[in-house]
């Protein structure tokens, strides 16, 4: 028999440990999905207590798991490092594996709602150079870096648009205030919170390029969504984005805002030369293909 834990369960994992060990004693193979280990790597990115709770979860699952199955090769590598750093006392090191998540965007049931001025907005930006960021505004997502870089571009006379779709998250009060002020005072910056799937779909179809600026991710679903919509990608040069997008994206040095400025200008130059990478070249999977890959990892 196989037991597969598909989601993070911080609140009850310690109480469940005796049950899991008894299941294992009776011959059940225990596997846990790992989406990332970022709270262990960067506790400063999370609200108080979350990193400690995650550390407790990680300690238990590495004590009892036969397998830890990660959602990318990059996460698997991170887990391997954390197993060494935390020197977990287990009866045997869990077997590590990885697979990729799927995406069947056309077969989802999207939320439908457009603001009254949506047609005017998209009709305007579709003819302008517009970069799109998708995801909750939180410390690791790179919104501060993007705002710094685009502010520099605007000061230097470039009129590129930056569109952010994503609600305010945690530990970003000052950044959110800055973004709100910028959206009111700068005609090239737009921040939409609570946007519907229909609005996001229009954004993917109307913008010029997806800007993926995160410092770290477990996978990077917006890159896959961009590929489905044939939207070019400019991504921070991190391992998981290289893994997901390969040669189907341009990459920038995210160590400073100047690196992003250089990346944006390089992307624009290559766009003018019709030399940007083709986003449809990403290796994407359906959810059925992803499920089959997961079953392969379980060796069922």
Where are these regions (language model features)?
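Carbohydrate transferase catalytic cores enriched for Leloir-type hexosyltransferases
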Residues: 1-300
